[in-house]
């Protein structure tokens, strides 16, 4: 029997980066807000206390704060003709499952998207014409420009205490910053990180080629900081253990260090943990949401009525809930019709590893996004004529903290196991670093998300199925980027070089990034998008879908800052426009 609860005004499904912002901003209206989170509550002072915060087995290898794949996972295949199989262990990406979501174990890379990223299709056609379009490309403009969202980027940066140096301040290029970034209305709230030895070597070589290195924006505090919500964070001490871990020093911005504790001050807000939402419930004509159904910690089915439902969980869960709820037309890649599940994209990654006899880097000292980058090859910052691809990559020397299990690098030709491998691992731990080529990914017809016809979760519901492989565009992009990285690496002058290109076929096994996007793309046309520019469902106007699921394709830059900015943007649209007169906003 389903338990029916008293109605509330607004339900937010997922209390991570996006959901926490939406709960906080909407709680100020005085309406009854309920945040539903399927994971457990985290107490950073307990769960991430030293020395336990540096337990790599617990957090990285055993996935303590990540999604429980024994209860729900996804299935994967490269092509439509193949049978998809379940992902049984964390591999290519790491969705979170706790209050704060993936925002608890992220690496604190806090880059904005480029203006080009929001208008990929129109700008590509304007500059290069139709002959430059990738094969089977489904990429599209967002329906939202960089200029429209700039103030919300600024708002989120000041909530998360991002450190950096402006490169384009109100149209004036600033020394020390990224000259290719979109215009900023003001400086970062925190100063840029200090450059490491590896970063200095990279910067010197890049400058000799006429490139413009800068320090990557970071949400690991470069100085003590109190944010817009009066939450105070300490300064990063470069202790490493950022990716896959919480921060023992309370220096990494996350939903639990910047937003969620302030929600306790709002008596009209309630957080419910261990609530696994299984569908959005619709009225008899399917045009209005009347609430959600979830499974609680005791296995009971609960219906929570609400006037407004906001899906703010991870890309996969947002898309799956839309499919399970019958909101929007599922995408059919054969007919190239439908929208839900369309435009799934990822990011490309490649690197050049450098090994030295005469240089020591102490890589155990590092911090979130402690990185020196160049954007000369990012987005459309260079002429793509004749290259055979669109988009680009940023090149970076990263000093994020080399953990003892995951961060073992050995020179090419080293045996994969045994005494010689051990000797090489010990000898080279302190004497290597890599130049990474972080590339974008265009959406295309054969890459999509749908419901698996065979496999089900612990509640008997179909798993999400991913069909994905690299396209020719991504292969060419990554090959170009790794050649540019190799040029810089050779100037640095290592004793040995190891080139690690993009795999010919995408594999879900090795970790790459937790930057999965699309499936509920935003846009100006209901025929090619799930949500409008305010992230409001075209089909069910009292449902908003906020997160990286809204990206129509992926930038080379990490998505978290854009997810946060979109949450701030949507919160304002709901407060200022929708609540006064509930209706389609576009």
Feature names for model-found ranges:
Residues 12, 16-17, 193, 197, ...:
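Residue-level detector of alpha-helix initiation sites
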Residues 28, 32-35, 39-58, 266, ...:
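Glycine-rich loop(s) and the adjacent beta-strand/alpha-helix scaffold that form part
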Residues 216-222, 238-242, 278-283, 430-441, ...:
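A glycine-rich dinucleotide-binding beta-alpha-beta segment and adjacent secondary-structure elements
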């Amino acid at each position: 029997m389903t338990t029916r609860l008293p109605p509330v005004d607004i339900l937010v499904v997922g209390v991570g980066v996006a959901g926490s912002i939406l709960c906080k901003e909407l709680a100020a209206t005085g309406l009854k807000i309920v945040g539903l989170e399927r994971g457990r509550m985290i107490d950073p002072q307990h769960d991430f206390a030293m020395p336990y915060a540096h337990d790599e087995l617990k957090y990285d290898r055993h996935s303590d704060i990540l999604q429980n794949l024994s209860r729900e996972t996804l299935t994967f295949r490269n092509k439509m003709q193949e049978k998809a199989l379940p992902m049984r262990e964390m591999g290519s990406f790491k969705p979170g499952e706790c209050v704060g979501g993936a925002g608890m174990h992220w690496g604190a890379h806090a880059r904005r998207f480029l203006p080009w990223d929001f208008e990929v299709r129109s700008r590509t056609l304007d500059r290069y014409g139709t002959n430059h379009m990738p094969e089977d490309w489904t990429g599209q403009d967002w329906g939202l420009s960089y200029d429209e969202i700039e103030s919300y980027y600024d708002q989120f940066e000041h909530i998360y205490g991002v450190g950096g140096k402006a490169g384009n301040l109100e149209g004036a290029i600033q020394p020390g910053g990224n000259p290719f970034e979109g215009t900023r209305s003001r400086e970062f709230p925190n100063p840029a990180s200090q450059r490491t030895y590896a970063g200095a070597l990279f910067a010197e070589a890049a400058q000799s080629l006429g490139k413009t290195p800068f320090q990557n924006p970071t949400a690991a505090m470069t100085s003590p900081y109190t944010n817009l919500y009066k939450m105070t964070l300490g300064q990063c001490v470069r202790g490493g253990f950022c990716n896959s871990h919480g921060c023992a020093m309370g220096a990494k911005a996350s939903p639990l260090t910047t937003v969620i504790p302030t929600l306790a001050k709002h008596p009209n807000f309630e957080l419910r943990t261990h609530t696994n939402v299984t569908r959005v419930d619709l009225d008899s004509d399917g045009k209005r949401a009347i609430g959600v159904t979830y499974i609680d910690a005791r296995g009971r089915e609960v219906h929570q009525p609400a006037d407004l439902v906001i899906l703010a969980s991870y890309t996969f869960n947002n898309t799956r809930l839309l499919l399970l709820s019958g909101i929007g037309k599922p995408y059919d890649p054969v007919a190239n019709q439908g929208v839900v599940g369309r435009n799934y994209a990822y990011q490309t990654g490649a690197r050049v590893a450098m090994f030295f006899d005469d240089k020591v880097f102490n890589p155990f000292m590092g911090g979130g996004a402690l990185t020196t980058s160049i954007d000369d090859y990012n987005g459309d910052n260079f002429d793509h004529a004749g290259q055979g691809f669109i988009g680009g990559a940023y090149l970076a020397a990263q000093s994020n903290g080399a953990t003892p299990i995951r961060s073992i690098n050995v020179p090419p030709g080293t045996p994969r196991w045994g005494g010689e491998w051990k000797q090489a691992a010990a000898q080279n731990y302190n004497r290597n670093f890599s130049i990474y080529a972080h590339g974008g990914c265009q959406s295309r017809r054969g890459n999509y998300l749908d419901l698996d016809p065979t496999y089900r979760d612990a509640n008997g519901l179909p798993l999400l199925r991913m069909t994905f492989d690299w396209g020719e565009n991504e292969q060419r992009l990554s090959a170009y980027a790794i050649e540019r990285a190799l040029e810089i690496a050779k100037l640095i002058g290592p004793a040995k070089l190891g080139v690690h290109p993009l795999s010919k076929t995408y594999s879900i096994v090795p970790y790459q990034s937790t930057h999965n996007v699309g499936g509920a793309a935003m846009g100006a046309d209901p025929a090619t998008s799930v949500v409008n520019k305010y992230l409001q469902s075209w089909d069910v106007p009292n449902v908003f879908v906020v997160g990286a699921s809204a990206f129509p394709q992926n930038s080379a830059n990490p998505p978290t800052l854009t997810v946060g900015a979109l949450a701030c943007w949507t919160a304002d649209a709901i407060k200022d426009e929708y609540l006064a007169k509930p209706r389609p906003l576009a």
